[in-house]
Regions:
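Residues on the lipid-exposed face of transmembrane beta-strands in outer-membrane beta-barrel proteins
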Residues: 1, 46-50, 100-104, 160-164, ...
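Repeated loop/turn-to-beta-strand initiation elements of outer-membrane beta-barrel proteins
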Residues: 1, 9, 54-59, 108-114, ...
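Post-signal-peptide, soluble extracytosolic/periplasmic N-terminal scaffold domains
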Residues: 1-56, 61-64, 74
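Transmembrane beta-strands of outer-membrane beta-barrel pores
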Residues: 3-9, 52-56, 63-67, 118-122, ...
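Outer-membrane beta-barrel translocator domains and adjoining extracellular loop/strand segments
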Residues: 11-20, 25, 29-34, 70-78, ...
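Short sequence motifs at beta-strands and strand-loop junctions characteristic
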Residues: 36-40, 90-94, 150-154, 207-211, ...
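Hydrophobic, lipid-facing positions within transmembrane beta-strands of outer-membrane proteins
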Residues: 42-46, 94-100, 156-160, 213-217, ...
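Outer-membrane beta-barrel strand-turn architecture
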Residues: 51-54, 94, 104-108, 164-170, ...
Length: 247
């Protein structure tokens, strides 16, 4: 079992766009200001191990908890009236992950190893933006459809490999690997001003699901102590899909 706690405070330089009110966003200039930091990061590792005559296994949990005590930072514009503008800070987020790994020896020459993992990552920090500047060229034409992203991503992984030392000089292997990154965040339409300050744009966030399969059949033959021949067949397949797309 392992637990870590880290507190970070101070300031870090960060660059972002700023423009004088009531000008349009086409009058933007780059500002570099010290952004206050007040972070708390905690990680947890817990594992249980088992070892038998022919097999071994490990079940583990990993948790990561990041919290930013600030949500937004307000600063005075570089020109024009004394108007404050808003810059969001890093969003707080949480990750939970379960892992299972192990292996088994069928015989002295044939062995199998594999692993499974399941992770859940979430982020639900409130948005920070200057909706009050519209319609004078502010970033948002209308208020955001949601107060926060309410983002969540589920990741799944599985792998399995079988090896066989067929002869002294010949080794055969077969392996499979599967990865699935499923973004469950809802898709919403966000309306904001384009960079020219005259046109508006409507863009949805696009939560994608990406699945990847990998397979390999291979043989290694040792010619002598310094040379060997490897023959392998690999198959990679990637699927991308979007279950929801705001219109």
């Amino acid at each position: 079992f392992e637990f870590n706690h880290l507190d970070q405070s101070g300031a870090k330089l960060q660059a972002f766009g700023s423009y004088p009110y009531p000008s349009t966003v086409s009058s933007q200039r780059i500002s570099i200001l010290p952004m206050p930091t007040n972070y708390r990061t905690e990680t947890v590792n817990a594992a249980v191990n088992w070892v038998g005559d022919r097999g071994h296994a490990t079940a583990a949990y990993f948790g990561s908890f990041f919290h930013d005590n600030y949500n937004v930072v307000q600063f005075q514009t570089f020109a024009g009236a004394n108007v404050m503008q808003t810059m969001p800070t890093y969003p707080s987020n949480v990750l939970h992950q379960l892992n299972l790994n192990g292996g088994y020896a069928f015989s002295a020459r044939t062995k199998m190893a594999g692993g499974l993992s399941y992770g859940y990552n979430s982020q639900n920090t409130m948005y920070g933006y200057d909706s009050g500047l519209a319609p004078k060229g502010g970033p948002m034409v209308v208020a955001s459809p949601t107060a926060s992203l309410n983002g969540s991503v589920i990741t799944t992984h599985a792998d399995l490999k079988l090896t066989d030392q067929t002869t002294k000089d010949l080794a055969l292997s077969a392996g499979l690997k599967y990865d699935d990154r499923d973004n469950h965040t809802a898709s919403n339409m966000y309306s904001f001003n384009a960079i020219n300050g005259a046109d508006t744009t409507r863009y949805p966030n696009t939560p994608l699901r990406v699945k990847k399969w990998q397979g390999e059949l291979a043989g290694d033959y040792r010619i002598d102590a310094k040379q060997k021949i490897r023959l392998a067949y690999n198959h990679d397949q990637t699927d991308r899909e979007c279950n929801q797309y705001a219109v």
